[in-house]
Amino acid sequence: MFEVTDDARIVGYRPLLPPAILLEELPLTEHASHTVTRGRRQAEKIIQGEDDRLLVVVGPCSIHDTKAALEYADHLQSVVEGLQNDLLIIMRVYFEKPRTTIGWKGLINDPHLDGSFDINNGLRTARRLLLDLAHRGLPAGTEFLDVITPQFMADLVAWGAIGARTTESQIHREMASGLSMPVGFKNGTDGSVQIAIDAIGAARHPHHFLSVTKQGISAIVSTAGNPNCHVILRGSNSGPNHHAEAVKACAEATSKAGLGTRLLIDCSHGNSRKDHRNQPTVAGEVAAQVAAGDRSICGVMLESHLVEGKQNQSSATPLVYGQSITDACISWTQTVPVLQELAAAVRARRAAG
């Protein structure tokens, strides 16, 4: 009698929608393609030091309500024109959430917030939102966590991120080497910048790895390498790394590795000591460095939503509209002065030559 040696801990399989079917249902339009391409090209120029503006990735910690996300997008779009000479604003649109242990893994994994894990619907909802944003002329940025999800939506993403928990992962470095947009790698949760530097070096090179095609067929993927990757300083469990000394040390390390000196600073997470109320202060300190002439800082990240703070998921209590269910965010009204301060810093740096 044979022993069970395969799938011993698998409790079921469900069909996954092939990427090509979703792209047929919700196709990239000409207008959307212009939004995405413009965002990518401008971000690349900023990362390469050919554009002196700041790249600002701003938006909710995670997306759980597309109606609120679109309302936030409309607010953001209303300030873009007045700031576009100094800032390239990309909306943070995160559909996948890495968890330290367990918890809600994001809109793609559980779009109904009820443990039904309707992933096909989650992918469809995510792509529809990205299309809506692109049609508004607003480029989007997201974290790539699952290495298959780019096939469903990467054509609508202007800037991508690899999180602190996955920067050291070989498959994420390989994936980044084939992504069509600039990609930021965060320093590790322990504060190590070297793993992000190593990741950028790896992602610049061609790779060959296992993945799936748009038709959902298993394939060996060969990539060309991604020349537009950069470090994201996000602080760590032991404290911030957005101050001038840490920025200088990171820029020197990336330069020594032959990767340029440009980096982006996350004003949340370890840099805010996990207190959203500190984000404006962190952004102000970063702005001061920019105004003083620092040219290694090419951008910032902000976690911002319609309503300040965060809330817990509970079936017994209705969710507050426009408030995060993951990390706490600053409110929209708190966000606008931060954006204005960053824009003023760029003008000051520009004026100083």
Task: Show the residue positions of the predicted features.
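Active-site-facing alpha/beta catalytic cores
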Residues: F2-D6, A73, D86-V247, H269-G270, ...
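N- or domain-start disorder-to-order transition segments that initiate the globular core
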Residues: D7-I47
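Acidic (Asp/Glu)-rich catalytic clusters
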Residues: I47-E50, V80-Q84, R128-G137, T223, ...
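Internal helix-turn-beta structural module
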Residues: H305-R350
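A contiguous, surface-oriented mixed alpha/beta subdomain in the mid-to-C-terminal portion of proteins
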Residues: R234-S236, N241, A249-L264
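Conserved, mostly hydrophobic/aromatic
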Residues: G59, I265, S331
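Conserved phosphate/anionic-ligand binding catalytic regions in large, soluble enzymes, centered on
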Residues: L55-A68, D327
